């Protein structure tokens, strides 16, 4: 019988690849997405449409509003940087977001009797977010096994799976394509137009386009004219 796993699933390139990997590894995927007050819903709407076709047994959308706290260009009226990927943590970082997301995933996993959680973080082609690093994931995994009834009573050991963490974006894309991922049904842009065209200039678009270029392929999503 397949083991249950909770997959953090935004509808973006990385999380979609992560879902496909979990399925290929024999897990029974339970997808979890978040409506957290993000400035656009294009990614979330794709997640809603894709989760079940990708094999999710259930798809839970958790709603809360991080706009009340602000502090990020993804949740507040702060301009999304378009100058390229820098060395500092950018304003698109959402304070403690992965800790919040993983905490919800941990709660659902414990309820399901699952001990495996997948998250599509990457520490190579990424924007420098602190909650995407291997040491952060290791720390959260330790906490998960100390902070839950299932972990303390020894029913099992929680594992946070990060299959993309040491891959380049090109390697992620190649892996996904080998598993049948349709990247035309994913969204990565931080600042899309009203008709959901990707801007081509934010960190996320730049990393995505770089990945497709290095993989020798054309990104199937639509971009603002002249930005692809």
Swiss-Prot record:
Belongs to the QueC family. This is 7-cyano-7-deazaguanine synthase. Keywords: ATP-binding, Ligase, Metal-binding, Nucleotide-binding, Queuosine biosynthesis, Zinc. GO terms for molecular function: ATP binding; ligase activity, forming carbon-nitrogen bonds; zinc ion binding. It comes from Geotalea uraniireducens (strain Rf4). Zn(2+) binds at residues 189, 199, 202, 205. ATP binds at residues 9-19. Its EC number is 6.3.4.20. Pathway: Purine metabolism; 7-cyano-7-deazaguanine biosynthesis. It catalyses: 7-carboxy-7-deazaguanine + NH4(+) + ATP = 7-cyano-7-deazaguanine + ADP + phosphate + H2O + H(+). Pfam families: QueC (PF06508). It is an enzyme of class 6 (ligase). Catalyzes the ATP-dependent conversion of 7-carboxy-7-deazaguanine (CDG) to 7-cyano-7-deazaguanine (preQ(0)). Its cofactor is Zn(2+). Disulfide bonds: none annotated. Binds 1 zinc ion per subunit.
């Amino acid at each position: 019988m397949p083991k249950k796993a909770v997959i953090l699933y935004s509808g973006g390139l990385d999380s979609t690849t992560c879902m496909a990997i979990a399925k290929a590894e024999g897990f029974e995927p339970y997808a979890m997405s978040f409506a957290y007050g993000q400035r656009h819903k294009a990614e979330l709407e794709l997640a809603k449409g894709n989760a079940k076709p990708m094999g999710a047994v259930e798809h839970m959308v958790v709603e809360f509003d991080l706009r009340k706290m602000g502090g990020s260009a993804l949740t507040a009226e702060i301009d999304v940087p378009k100058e390229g990927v820098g060395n500092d943590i950018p304003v698109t970082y959402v304070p403690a977001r992965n800790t919040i997301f993983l905490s919800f995933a941990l709660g659902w996993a414990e309820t399901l009797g699952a001990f495996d959680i997948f998250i599509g973080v990457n520490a190579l082609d990424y924007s420098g977010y602190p909650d995407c690093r291997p040491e952060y994931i290791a720390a959260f995994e330790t906490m998960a096994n100390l902070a839950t009834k299932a972990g303390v009573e020894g029913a099992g050991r929680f594992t946070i799976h990060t299959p993309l963490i040491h891959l380049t974006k090109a390697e992620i894309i190649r892996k996904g394509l080998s598993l049948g991922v349709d990247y035309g049904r994913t969204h990565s842009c931080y600042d899309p137009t009203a008709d959901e065209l990707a801007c081509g200039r934010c960190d996320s678009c730049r990393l995505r386009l770089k990945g497709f270029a290095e993989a020798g392929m054309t990104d199937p999503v639509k971009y603002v004219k002249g930005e692809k």
